[in-house]
Regions:
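Selective hydrophobic functional segments
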Residues: 66-119, 205-248
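Hydrophobic alpha-helical transmembrane segments in multi-pass integral membrane proteins
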Residues: 162-172, 208-216, 223, 260-270
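Residues within membrane-spanning alpha-helices of integral membrane proteins
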Residues: 26, 69, 124-128, 132, ...
Length: 270
């Protein structure tokens, strides 16, 4: 039997081995993962690209979210490794807060697994729209943070747990929310707080990914190219962000997010 194209060599079902995936599908996922990794580095909203890319390839909404979460695990590990200098002396704090976020991530995953798929489909447009608006007003939100160490510590722990649950459930723009909450709790430089955020967010994402891998419908065929893209984007992102004006970039991404939310909302509610 003759082979006429790379797509013919790699053609196969979405649920099979990634080696059998169509070349065009793999290319789309690598590209989406790369852009998602850049957005994750810049504005903490990788799902704005990768989630609709999975939907475009015919993956059901619930499975797309689970697949996206599993693919992000290596990105979290990479961000922690790259933040080792800033995490020096933060080990106990990361473990203490990481326990909270790990449990929260698992709880968010449990909510996703135990509720109907139709509920997730209906809620996602709201989550994406809300995340896009949070991104738009990000500087003002950060400006509202009180001095670290003040206020009710238990209230901050509850807020941290709630955001970690959101990480496990969907997670778009969760990094922004985590940065705000941790900024209230930790009396350190923004660079250090961001490094702690990367670590504890990675723990929430990891426990959610384990739950999805064990009990959910992860499309493993799509995980490898998407994860490869995330790794590439995570490396490119910091270099690119230094050269792009933050304000216009944030507004453009926010508007795209609102547009995506409207599109998904029309599809979900019609």
């Amino acid at each position: 039997m003759g082979i006429t194209s790379a797509e013919g060599v790699l053609g196969g079902a979405a649920g099979g081995s990634w080696l059998r995936m169509k070349f065009s599908e793999a290319l789309l996922l690598v590209a989406a993962g790369t852009l998602g990794g850049i957005l994750s580095t810049a504005v903490s909203i990788a799902s704005l690209v990768t989630y609709p890319a999975l939907l475009a390839l015919g993956v059901p909404p619930l499975s797309a979210n689970m697949t996206n979460t599993v693919s992000l695990v290596l990105t979290g590990a990479g961000s922690v490794l790259s933040s080792k200098p800033e995490l020096t002396g933060q080990g106990r704090r990361v473990i203490r807060l990481g326990i909270v976020t790990a449990i929260g991530g698992a709880a968010g995953a449990a909510v996703l697994l135990l509720t109907p798929a139709s509920t997730f489909t209906a809620v996602v447009p709201v989550l994406i729209g809300g995340a896009s608006l949070v991104l738009l007003v990000q500087p003002r939100i950060k400006g509202l943070s009180p001095s670290a160490g003040g206020g009710n510590k238990m209230a901050y722990i509850v807020a941290l747990f709630a955001v970690a649950m959101y990480v496990g459930y969907f997670g778009a723009a969760a990094g922004i929310l985590l940065l705000v909450v941790l900024g209230m709790m930790i009396d350190e430089s923004l660079v250090t707080v961001n490094a702690v955020k990367n670590a504890v967010s990675g723990m929430a994402n990891a426990t959610a990914a384990v739950c999805f891998a064990l009990f959910g419908d992860v499309r493993w065929a799509f995980v490898v190219p998407l994860a490869a893209g995330f790794l590439a984007g995570g490396w490119i992102g910091p270099k690119l962000v230094r050269k792009v004006p933050a304000g216009p970039f944030r507004v453009a991404v926010s508007l795209c997010g609102v547009g995506l939310a409207v599109r998904l909302g029309i599809s979900a509610y019609r």
